[in-house]
Amino acid sequence: MVLRSRRVWGVLGAIAIELAVALAAGMTGPVPSGSDGPRVRGAVAAGLYFDYLVTIVMENKDLCDVLTYCGGFSPYLTGLADAWGIADEDRYCNVNPSLPNYLCLTGGSDFGCAGYSGDPNSNACTTAAWNALNIVDRLESGGLTWKAYMEDMPSNCYARDSGEYAVRHNPFVYYDDIATNASRCARIVPSGNAAGTLLNDLGSTTTASNYLWFTPNDCNNMHSCRESIGDTYMSVLVPKILNSTVFRTTRAALFITFDEGYRFPTYAVWVGALVKTAYASSYGYTHYSVLATIESNWNLSPLTSNDRDAPHMGEFFLGQPSRGFRNPPPHPLPLAYVAAISGSGAVAVIVTGAILLRREKRRSSE
């Protein structure tokens, strides 16, 4: 196990609460599922790493746009990464803009949608996705349940933009066998005020699905608003998720990532009682690795060669071997030291230099 030796920044009080949640859950490491065949959902749908997974996808930030120690503006998310498990060389799907990355996370392909973020079934690439298999097909064939929550979506399975709801951030309506299936559409729901519907469902194992997806609106996900707004939003939401009945009493995990970056890695963090604490890996992951992890966890067939060949992220869970590779982003000089240097110009030079050094290091490693 590779432990991180860096200083924990930001909201220590919130982190202490989350660590307490992990201890209260009383969990040990993950256990094998015990069966290689299709699973039928009972009281618990046992997985290798977790039995319940909540995925939250944020918007349009490189890793060091988030982490405060390399130029970012999100102290809460920085503290969360320091306390739990971060993949700091996660390269999303190496494509822009948003839509193809959301499709990678749910369909195992960008379907040729580089440069496109239009409506479902609106051009050649979205038609390819429309006719493709997807993660919901795999989950249901494995006897698992799922539900997707969209902040500010007007109604179930809504397939057009509306206010701060962007349909391109709701990948599930891009697949024909979901969007035209009434029972499946009933599982793509508005998240309610402050993600209230999601939190209510996490209040019991009878209402929580095995696979839960949450897309915040275009302000809270940092797409249209400052990073500080999204960070504050997450500082309220994440502790509520971790303090829910499902997270306190079952083998549940939370995965937070960003849909895309701009030539640099994105934030990808695992949180929960079954996740290694103060852990980091610089192994090369992508959005396909998220699918590979879900498939490995529940013994599901891959959707495409992309997720089939992608490394899963099992190393972030207790009892699983580390890939043994760590290359942390460089830390700028401590703030106390910077403040001691006379003249605002010197401060600007030092801070700017630290950020440029980080960026140059990233370029040289690509």
Q: Where are the language model's segments positioned?
A:
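N-terminal pro-sequences and low-complexity stem/linker regions of secreted or lumenal proteins
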Residues: 31-325
